[in-house]
């Protein structure tokens, strides 16, 4: 696993303390990432309290989310599409110039793409040009099906040179299938959780997705000798979270 997103150090004391403890732990391969949002409307990135906490956090990588759907830009942010692009650009540039590696999550991307393809692509390009190493396309409400995910991600990877990631939810029971479709269409970064633990109906189950992609489709994601640890890890997480793995694949 390349990145472990450990929480939002700005949101609560427990997450902040977790990052303090993680600073003392050396991992063999994985990199710890913090999570937060782009700057608020009406203030600079330098003055945004959430971004300042991400800048000061021990994690070298910051994952930040921003808007990609004009409906939310107008109704939730209360700003213009142009200002939203500036918010994304300035937030990423601020973190990058302060030594952070940045992954940008394009929230509700697929809804935004269906509503306005050109603007959604502008969001992707803006984030990448500002310094984001990956731009993650988020099916935030879990309403997409694999065929449309494949079609849209294929178009994005053909039209841009941006390293694309995928983030899916299981509200339609399609999180793993949509994630696999995105990889087959050219996505190079997968977000998910062990056993699919997550809000509402859950996220893509990494244990299932990794096994399916590597064992069934031939992608090399983890060392062969690490494959048996997927089951061990899934059972350990199930015990900690008190969520049964009965009936889950592998």
Predicted regions and their residues:
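Catalytic cores and adjacent flexible loops of soluble metabolic enzymes
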Residues: 1-250
